[in-house]
Amino acid sequence: MIVYGGGASEDGEGGGVVLKKGPWTVAEDETLAAYVREYGEGNWNSVQKKTWLARCGKSCRLRWANHLRPNLRKGSFTPEEERLIIQLHSQLGNKWARMAAQLPGRTDNEIKNYWNTRLKRFQRQGLPLYPPEYSQNNHQQQMYPQQPSSPLPSQTPASSFTFPLLQPPSLCPKRCYNTAFSPKASYISSPTNFLVSSPTFLHTHSSLSSYQSTNPVYSMKHELSSNQIPYSASLGVYQVSKFSDNGDCNQNLNTGLHTNTCQLLEDLMEEAEALADSFRAPKRRQIMAALEDNNNNNNFFSGGFGHRVSSNSLCSLQGLTPKEDESLQMNTMQDEDITKLLDWGSESEEISNGQSSVITTENNLVLDDHQFAFLFPVDDDTNNLPGIC
């Protein structure tokens, strides 16, 4: 007998409730069944308080599960149940409660008793515990355990990827970089040159291209709507777009972006013109020096022109290459110098007027074609530069 404290005896003296152990009587079974029909399964510790049954909660639970359940099945296991027990044991091992859940009406204690009895019998006879098909499956599961399948990485939209070169430029002031004129400073200060020469940009651009080729799902294909203004620098390298549909805010941002773009392009044009002027000045000085040297030479057209011209002036003339993008002022100045040279040649007393043929230009200048044609190829348009190669 077990004394369960907290209660009071019939004679009024303090004491505990005496819990009963051992076999259950028919009256106790009927009391427990009536409690389950009224309150349902569970909360077995309240059975004693509500029915004054002198049994603990664990004893009530086991009595109901193993003996009093309506769907409880008694007797030996059927061949189908035995086959299922063997299959489940080969997969789960000694998980008796999980095996009992697969066998309605059977308790985990019954399944455990059946397996232990079978195990001892097969060990005495030297027989395998599992049939060949179950043994092979069990061996394969031990050799190659099932790994939890890792979920596929979520496919993030391409627009959520952030690349430094795909971000819109910040609305910085006009002179946000060094504009001091020098070949090195201008090349470094130019955003376009910086992007082209930066190895970080080349690496990012190549990585992005390879990433798009291997992953077509992430290929970035954006279609610009009517209120989206693309921003592009020279060489088509730095390309960004503003994707927003927020009315006035979007309009203000696009206006500021367009203004910043125009200012940046103006700065680039100014630096390009300054750089071009720096390279034109030495060429212009070489031409003027050559013309002055030729004017000082009295025998310019006599005895063969190629032998009279000094080596320095000839090299300077041969090193010149006409460019189509020179300014109109440069062309006018050179035309005036050539006209002076031709005027001087027409007034020279050493021009031969013998058997050689002469050429009359639009300015009524008479020249010897043998002495003049090999230096300057004559063109109908006198405003064009002579083809010096």
Curated annotation (Swiss-Prot):
Any one GO molecular-function label of the UniProt entry: DNA-binding transcription factor activity
What Gene Ontology cellular component terms go with this record? nucleus; pollen tube
Q: Which InterPro entries match?
A: Homeodomain-like_sf, Myb_dom, SANT/Myb
Record keywords:
Activator, DNA-binding, Nucleus, Repeat, Transcription, Transcription regulation
Q: What are the start and end residues of every segment in region (Disordered)?
A: 131-159
Q: Report the DNA-binding ranges.
A: 44-68, 96-119
Q: Which Pfam families match?
A: Myb_DNA-binding
Ranges for the HTH myb-type domain? 16-68, 69-123
CDD domains (alphabetical)? SANT (cd00167)
Gene3D superfamilies membership: Homeodomain-like (1.10.10.60)
GO BP terms in the entry: pollen sperm cell differentiation; positive regulation of DNA-templated transcription; regulation of DNA-templated transcription; regulation of gene expression; regulation of pollen tube growth
Keyword RNA-binding listed? The answer is: no
For this protein, the record's SUPFAM superfamilies field holds:
Homeodomain-like (SSF46689)
Composition bias, kind Low complexity: at what positions? 140-159
Tissue pattern of expression reads:
Accumulates in pollen grains and pollen tube. Mostly expressed in mature pollen grains, and, to a lower extent, in inflorescences and siliques.
Q: What does this protein do?
A: Transcription activator. Binds to 5'-CAACTGTC-3' and/or 5'-TAACAAA-3' motif in target gene promoter to promote their expression. Together with MYB101 and MYB120, functions as a male factor that controls pollen tube-synergid interaction in fertilization. Required for pollen tube growth arrest and sperm cell release in the female gametophyte, probably via the regulation of pollen tube-specific gene expression.
Q: What is this protein called?
A: Transcription factor MYB97
Organism taxonomic ancestry: Eukaryota, Viridiplantae, Streptophyta, Embryophyta, Tracheophyta
- Gene for this protein? MYB97
